[in-house]
Amino acid sequence: MGNRAFKAHNGHYLSAEHDHVKTHHGHHDHHTHFHIENHGSKVALRTHCGKYVSIGDHKQVYLSHHLHGDHSLFHLEHHHGKVSIKGHHHHYISVDGHGHVSTSHHHDHHATFEEHIL
């Protein structure tokens, strides 16, 4: 499916740095590029350094060195020109008002991103 960048409601892009997913870049660069891999009806988000965005059993967002089954697979839900990233246990990747990346069981503007095709 190619590379994507995801811009949060706060104007910052999801960014993969070291073992963390953050949002402190107001512009996109290689840290904010995610390769979308098809896995049947779901997708995986692979970072520039080959790690996978994942959601753990305690609903934390982390980067994994390997594809961790359902923990690393997502549905991209498109609506009204935006996208939501729905993952493990039906939780959405979310960005709070301070830019902290976590998950939310609720689908609201914190869990909605502008999708930029690169």
Swiss-Prot record:
Q: Keyword Membrane: yes or no?
A: yes
Q: Can you name a GO cellular component term?
A: phagocytic vesicle
Q: How does it sit in the membrane?
A: Lipid-anchor
Lipidation positions, renumbered (N-myristoyl glycine):
G2
User: sequence repeats located where?
Assistant: 34-46, 74-86
Processing and modification events after translation: Phosphorylated.
Q: Which UniProt keywords apply?
A: Actin-binding, Cell membrane, Cytoplasm, Disulfide bond, Lipoprotein, Membrane, Myristate, Phosphoprotein, Repeat
What GO terms are given for molecular function? Answer: actin filament binding; fatty acid binding; lipid binding; protein-macromolecule adaptor activity
List every stretch annotated Contains several HHXH repeats: 8-109
List every stretch annotated 2 X 13 AA approximate repeats. 34-86
Q: Which InterPro entries match?
A: Actin-crosslinking, Fascin-like_dom, Hisactophilin
List locations, semicolon-separated: Cytoplasm; Cell membrane
Does the record carry Ribonucleoprotein as a key word? Answer: no
Q: Name one GO biological process term.
A: hyperosmotic response
The ranges of region (Disordered) come to 99-118
- What is the top-level taxon of the source organism? Eukaryota
Chief subcellular location: cytoplasm
Function, as annotated, reads: May act as an intracellular pH sensor that links chemotactic signals to responses in the microfilament system of the cells by nucleating actin polymerization or stabilizing the filaments.
Can you tell me which family this protein belongs to? Belongs to the hisactophilin family.
Subunit structure as annotated in this protein's UniProt entry:
Homodimer or heterodimer of hatA and hatB, linked by a disulfide bond.
Protein name in UniProt = Hisactophilin-2
Name of encoding gene: hatB
